Amino acid sequence: MCAARLAAAAAQSVYAFSARPLTGGEPVSLGSLRGKILLIENVASLUGTTVRDYTQMNELQRRLGPRGLVVLGFPCNQFGHQENAKNEEILNSLKYVRPGGGFEPNFMLFEKCEVNGAGAHPLFAFLREALPAPSDDATALMTDPKLITWSPVCRNDVAWNFEKFLVGPDGVPLRRYSRRFQTIDIEPDIEALLSQGPSCA
C-alpha cells in the first residue's frame, strides 16, 4: 500500500492533511480551517469548464466566505493534460487566458498535484475513500480510457477536472459532486450546513 493510501486509511478527517500554496511558502494544515465548511475541487486552467467553474468558485467564496465557507482549489494535470502550466505560470494563465480579463481567484489555490494513482495527494486518496462516487452521478467514470495516465486505476477515482468535495465543519467529507454538477448549484447544500451554526469540533 502506497504512503498516500496509508495516510488516507489512518485519517478520520481532512484535518490530518496539509498542502503547499500555489505561490509557495510553508504547507497549510487543513487543521487550521477547523470549524469551516470546505469546498475542495481539482481544477485545471485549460478545461472546457474552466471559466464556468473558476468564476463560480469565486462567487461562492465571495458570498459565503464571510459566513464560514472556504473554497480550496488543487490544480491537476491528469485529465487531458489541461493543467500543463508550471505552478508559477498558473495565476497568469487564469488572469490573461482563461477565464482571462484580469481574473484573479479569491480562494486558496495549492501547488499542482495528482488526485489519482500511486502518486495521489493523500488528501485526495482520503476523499475518494470517504466518498467513493459522486452523489449526482454514481456511475461517473473517465469517459475515454485512452486518457488514463495513472496506475493503479480504482473505481473511486476522480473522473475529470472540477470534481467537488463538500466537507463539514468537523472535517468529515459529506458529499461528492461530478464534473457535470455546476459549482454554483452546491450553494443550497452549503447554506444548509452554514445554517446549523458553528461546530464544536
From Swiss-Prot:
- Localization in the cell: Cytoplasm
Tell me the residues on which N6-acetyllysine occurs: 86, 112, 146
**One Gene Ontology cellular component annotation held by this UniProt entry:** cytosol
Which keywords appear in this protein's UniProt record, sorted alphabetically? Acetylation, Cytoplasm, Lipid metabolism, Oxidoreductase, Peroxidase, Phosphoprotein, Selenocysteine
Residues of the site described as Subject to oxidation and hydroselenide loss to dehydroalanine: 47
Which residues carry the post-translational modification N6-succinyllysine, per the record?
A: 86, 112, 146
GO biological-process terms attached to the record: arachidonate metabolic process; glutathione metabolic process; hydrogen peroxide catabolic process; lipoxygenase pathway; response to hydrogen peroxide; response to selenium ion
| Keyword Methyltransferase found | no
Q: Give the annotated active site.
A: 47
- Please explain the role this protein plays, according to its UniProt record: Protects the hemoglobin in erythrocytes from oxidative breakdown. In platelets, plays a crucial role of glutathione peroxidase in the arachidonic acid metabolism.
- Specify the protein name: Glutathione peroxidase 1
* Species in which this protein is naturally found: Hylobates lar (Lar gibbon)
Q: Which gene encodes it?
A: GPX1
